[in-house]
């Protein structure tokens, strides 16, 4: 780690083709399950993920639970890698997945100590290397690795071309007597900006009755408006929101067109910037599936899945948007809405994947705003 701390463990996943197998900002994730979804979430681009759960890998890997086509994180740190894969859905092991995609893993690490260091000292750059005889060199490489601040990582994960999402909704195993899963009527035409979009979001939009067209992150607003969508979705993604000015400008123009807009995670931050606010880097971010958030309208508490290292500055949004949700851990902004336009966003992940489904209602709210606009 860049502060000089060195942890020694056992490598798995990618073989070292040089001095360093993985380099990035090290974060910790408090989810007990869902490591496959975490690994394949494009929002983790440029980060080394430490799982706080003590044993990882016991349910293996299956193709259905991928949130994208591949793992995106720079490295993976666990306390104990399970030597056994035991799940009827598994088609491979965690080690095989990381090895196939060149992602470095390390096991045998005191992840409680790593988590505590990050929590107290803040986010740090780190490397995973098999060159164990040169710890000072590894620390130097960590310090020389670029920070996430100011980096546009969206261009590295976004789709290269526009496409329609038509994957059937997966509802888990069903008894034969219940028949196939019914796909709802597709009543709403939605354009989704891909800043690193998760498949769980696309599935949830489709299950809400949305016909989804996914566009690259740098698509100008005029091209989106030419499609004549009923609403626009701003997705999750990696990196610094202040570094994606093209996305902020497009969001600003789309809001001016008075279309319903729904943003999640990076999309929430981009929307905040588009409305005239500011963002800042958190000390160590929110990563996990157990974060309590209060809906300020209903005063109800939701347990949410989160994955972000930046946040919207609440003071900068005064007079520009209404605060709708707040973190009960650190009081940071977790949701906002425009006072007059059908525009709203949340910092957390209502689709979960992995995590609780307390906030699924937000997709229904998005559909309701499109329905209301159609009736006018």
Describe each model-derived feature in a short phrase.
Residues 226, 230-231, 236-314, 355-365, ...:
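Cysteine-nucleophile active-site neighborhood
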Residues 1-222, 226-227, 241, 353-355, ...:
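RNA-binding accessory domains that recognize and position tRNA/RNA substrates
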């Amino acid at each position: 780690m860049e502060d000089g701390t060195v942890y020694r463990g056992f490598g798995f996943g990618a073989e070292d083709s040089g001095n360093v197998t993985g380099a990035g900002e090290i974060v910790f994730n408090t989810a007990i399950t869902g490591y496959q979804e975490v690994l394949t979430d494009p929002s983790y681009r440029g980060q080394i993920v430490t799982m706080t759960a003590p044993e990882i890998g016991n349910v293996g890997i299956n193709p259905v639970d991928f949130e994208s086509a591949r793992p995106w994180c720079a490295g993976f740190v666990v306390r104990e890698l399970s030597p056994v894969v035991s799940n009827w859905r598994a088609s491979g092991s965690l080690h095989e997945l990381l090895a196939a995609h060149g992602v470095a893993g390390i096991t045998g690490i005191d992840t409680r100590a790593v988590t505590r260091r990050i929590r107290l000292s803040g986010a740090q750059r780190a490397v995973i290397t098999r060159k164990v005889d040169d710890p000072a060199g590894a620390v130097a490489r960590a310090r020389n690795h670029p920070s996430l601040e100011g980096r546009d990582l969206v261009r590295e994960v976004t789709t290269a071309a526009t496409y329609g999402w038509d994957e059937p909704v997966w509802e888990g195993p069903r008894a034969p007597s219940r028949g196939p899963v019914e796909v709802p009527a597709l009543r709403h035409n939605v354009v989704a900006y891909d800043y690193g979009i998760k498949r769980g979001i696309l599935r949830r939009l489709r299950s809400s009755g949305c016909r989804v067209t996914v566009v690259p992150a740098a698509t100008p607003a005029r091209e989106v408006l030419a499609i004549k969508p009923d609403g626009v979705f701003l997705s999750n993604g990696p990196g610094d929101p202040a570094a994606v000015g093209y996305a902020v400008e497009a969001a600003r123009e789309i809001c001016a067109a008075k279309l319903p807009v729904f943003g999640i995670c990076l999309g929430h931050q981009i929307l905040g910037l588009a409305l005239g606010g500011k963002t800042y880097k958190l000390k160590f971010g929110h990563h996990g599936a157990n974060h309590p958030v209060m809906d300020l309208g209903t005063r109800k508490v939701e347990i949410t899945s989160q994955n972000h290292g930046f946040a919207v500055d609440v003071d900068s949004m005064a007079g520009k948007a209404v605060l709708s949700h707040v973190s009960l851990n650190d009081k940071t902004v977790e949701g906002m809405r425009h006072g007059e336009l059908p525009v709203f966003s949340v910092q957390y992940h209502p689709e979960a994947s992995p995590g609780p489904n307390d906030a699924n209602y937000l997709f229904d709210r998005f559909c309701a705003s499109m329905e209301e606009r159609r009736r006018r």
